Swiss-Prot record:
Its EC number is 2.1.1.176. The active site is at C375. This is Ribosomal RNA small subunit methyltransferase B. NCBIfam families: PRK10901.1, PRK14902.1, rsmB. It holds the Pfam family Methyltr_RsmB-F. Belongs to the class I-like SAM-binding methyltransferase superfamily. RsmB/NOP family. S-adenosyl-L-methionine binds at C254, A255, A256, P257, G258, G259, K260, D277, D303, D322. It comes from Yersinia pestis bv. Antiqua (strain Angola). The gene is rsmB. It catalyses: cytidine(967) in 16S rRNA + S-adenosyl-L-methionine = 5-methylcytidine(967) in 16S rRNA + S-adenosyl-L-homocysteine + H(+).
Length: 429
């Protein structure tokens, strides 16, 4: 039966919602994917994520092919052309099919009179493709990052910035977290081998396994039974560092979507865990993850800057603060971050992080452990944040993660390793 929808027009609308309305792709896509097949769902995701990953290159190509950009109500057709270009450059979709479906998107978007224009631009690109892509390599669009972020990464990592950009521009690896309540990691690796799924263990993080080739979760042995969870290796490092113990009172702050909450309980099933997040909608994901893994935690809505409103005078043995951040370490998973973030956001986020860590510090027992973590690679949110905190609090002692002069541990994104992540483990003396 022929599909009644046009994927290219759906992708163009999704990209419009990201770039013109400031919505995240992860918020936009689920609604748009509701009535389409699993196979087409994967293609839609590829068209959206891929187009946003290489946006500057596609934008530059359009500038060479069109006298003036499409604006206002016609902007969505600008994105439709981008989706067409992405298919021609980066996918194995036969060019005639890519063109036909993209051009037909104009009819679905109720501007059939633009079909000729869109067809003409895409065919012109086909004729000039080799020359245009060679020229694109010689300008800043080649880096596929906004100029403000490129400048910050170069400044922070003068010797490594190129590798960071390369990692950001690649598809992310698929990491699993083995539930140690069901199997050891070596046992689960054997199950993967039996299922003809190639995988390897992480050299540092004890529950982490990388799939050599990503696959759908329904192909993973025991996924529905809670034997395994999809979670990046660097994110798993937070709980390894926290080292939760049975019987302890543990706070997971900024907990949604619940990956770290459930990891804490897999590591210490008799711990008493309070999971708190300011976003009530995202907390439903925490509950879903707890349910799938058959784990129990108290889940509450709350602002990290006002802990008295959600925990009263309760104190904790361990606190995991996965602070709100720029998410510049997970760009390869969420390429829309490059276009949703602004330079001014960084200082605002650093201020918010400072307010949260100050507010939550009194809730940690003496002798207790706080792990501060972000999925950022920017020093203002990480080393500088922790250096300032240690200066304000002589009773705070850094352990296992750097020195007072160079506080914390910074992971950078790597094609065969985890995302960009920062950790600081602090004991209250």
């Amino acid at each position: 039966m022929k599909n009644t929808y046009n994927l290219r027009s759906i992708a163009a609308k999704a990209i419009s919602q990201v770039l013109d309305q400031g919505q995240s792709l992860s918020a936009v896509l689920p609604e748009l994917q509701k009535n389409i097949s699993d196979k087409d769902r994967a293609l839609l995701q590829e068209l959206c994520f891929g187009t946003l990953r290489v946006l500057p290159q596609l934008e530059w190509c359009i500038q060479q092919l069109m006298a003036r950009p499409m604006t206002g109500k016609q902007r969505v057709f600008h994105y439709l052309i981008m989706v067409g270009l992405y298919q021609l450059i980066y996918t194995r979709i036969p060019p005639h099919a890519a063109l036909a479906e993209t051009v037909e998107g104009a009819t679905v978007l109720k501007r059939p009179q633009l079909k000729g224009l869109i067809n003409g631009v895409l065919r012109q690109f086909q004729r000039q493709q080799v020359e245009l892509l060679e020229r694109a390599v010689n300008n800043d669009s080649h880096y596929l990052h906004p100029s403000w972020l490129l400048a910050r990464i170069k400044q922070a990592y003068p010797a490594q910035w190129q590798q960071i950009l390369d990692a950001n521009n690649q598809r992310p690896p698929m990491w699993l977290r083995v539930n140690r309540q069901h199997h050891s990691r070596s046992e689960y690796l054997e199950l993967l081998t039996q299922a003809d799924i190639n995988a390897e263990p992480h050299p540092i993080y004890r529950d982490a396994v990388r799939l050599i080739t990503p696959c759908a979760v329904n192909h993973l042995p025991g996924f529905e039974l809670g034997w395994v969870t999809v979670q990046d290796a660097s994110a798993q490092g937070c709980v390894d560092l926290l080292d939760p113990q049975n019987g302890e009172q543990i706070l997971d702050l900024c907990a949604a979507p619940g990956g770290k909450t459930t990891h804490i309980l897999e590591a210490a099933p008799k711990a008493h865990v309070l999971a708190v997040d300011i976003d009530e909608q995202r907390l439903s994901r925490v509950k879903e993850n707890l349910q799938r893994l058959q784990l129990q935690a108290v889940v509450r809505v709350g602002d990290g800057r006002a802990p008295d409103t959600w925990c009263g005078d309760q104190q904790f043995d361990r606190i995991l603060l996965d602070a709100p951040c720029s998410a510049t370490g997970v760009i390869r998973r969420h390429p829309d971050i490059k276009w949703l973030r602004r330079d001014r956001d960084i200082s605002e986020l650093a201020q918010l992080q400072s307010e949260i860590i100050e507010a939550i510090w009194p809730k940690l027992k003496h002798g207790g452990v706080l792990v501060y973590a972000t999925c950022s690679i920017l020093p203002e949110e990480n080393q500088q944040q922790i250096a300032a905190f240690l200066q304000r609090h002589p009773e705070a002692q850094l352990t296992e993660t750097g020195t007072t002069a160079a506080p914390g541990k910074q992971n950078l994104p790597h094609p065969e390793d985890g995302d960009g992540f920062f950790y600081a483990k602090i004991i209250k003396k």
